[in-house]
Structure formats: C-alpha cells, structure tokens
Curated annotation (Swiss-Prot):
Signal sequence segment: none
Classification via PANTHER family: NICKEL-RESPONSIVE REGULATOR, NICKEL-RESPONSIVE REGULATOR-RELATED
InterPro entries, sorted: Acetolactate_synth/TF_NikR_C (IPR027271), ACT-like_dom_sf (IPR045865), Arc_rbn_hlx_hlx (IPR013321), CopG (IPR002145), CopG/NikR_regulator (IPR050192), Ni_resp_reg_NikR (IPR022988), Ribbon_hlx_hlx (IPR010985), TF_NikR_Ni-bd_C (IPR014864)
Cofactors, names only: Ni(2+)
Keywords recorded for this protein, A-Z: DNA-binding, Metal-binding, Nickel, Transcription, Transcription regulation
Protein name, UniProt field: Putative nickel-responsive regulator
Role of this protein: Transcriptional regulator.
Amino acid sequence: MGVVSISMPDELEERIDTFADEHGYTGRSEVVREAVRNLMGEFEDKRLEDRELMAVVTVLFDYETTTVEEKMMHLRHDHESIVASNFHSHVGDRYCMELFVLEGQLEDISAFVGKVRATKDTLSVDYSVLPVDDINMFT
C-alpha cells in the first residue's frame, strides 16, 4: 500500500484522531481512506446518470474571506446553465452562507460541487441531490 502525505489544519487533525478513537478505527489513515471512498462514491453513483436532477448546495465561509464570495460569484456565472437560484445570507456576526439551487445532469452538478469544495477557505460545503423525475406533485 502506498503512503500519501496530506496537509490539514491542526484542528481537523485532532478531530480525525478523536473520531478514530471514538469509532474504533485503527488510526487516521483508516478514517481518511473511508472518507475518500465515500466521497468518490458520491460522484460515481450510476443511479443518477442520464436523469434530470435538482440539487441544493450550501457553502459557509468567514465574512472576512472575500475571496470565497468572489469565487462563488464566478462559479455562479460560469455555471449559469444549471444555477436556477442563488441566495447569500449573513449568519451571526462573522459568517456568510451561499446557497445554490441547481438543475441539470449529474456530470454538471458534480463538476459544480467539486469546484465549490475545492475553493480555499470554505468552512463547510453540503449538498443534496434529488431526481426531478421522482417528484410526484399529485401524491
């Protein structure tokens, strides 16, 4: 098995150690391997291919980190074909939340979410995806 070195904030490293201890993992590597498998599995879910989807993406970042807000603006414009709606809100005294409603194919939504997740200085990125063809408005 190969060895991979990664950088992360001390706080995240401590959280991984605590998580490993509390959940019976043998160490950080096992936690990171499982997290990577799960993340990759999210983007490789074949059940959602070739279907019309809607997604909600929520991004949390520090108010002082203007580069994140600027990056979100560029992503919104670069992906305007799938961004149905976008909402910006202040959370508490220090944070901003950016919410995107997307409509499109899995490949396009995955590309958007990947770019959001890759944005430096985001504190949290969450999303959910729902096939539009599963929605029965008359039930």
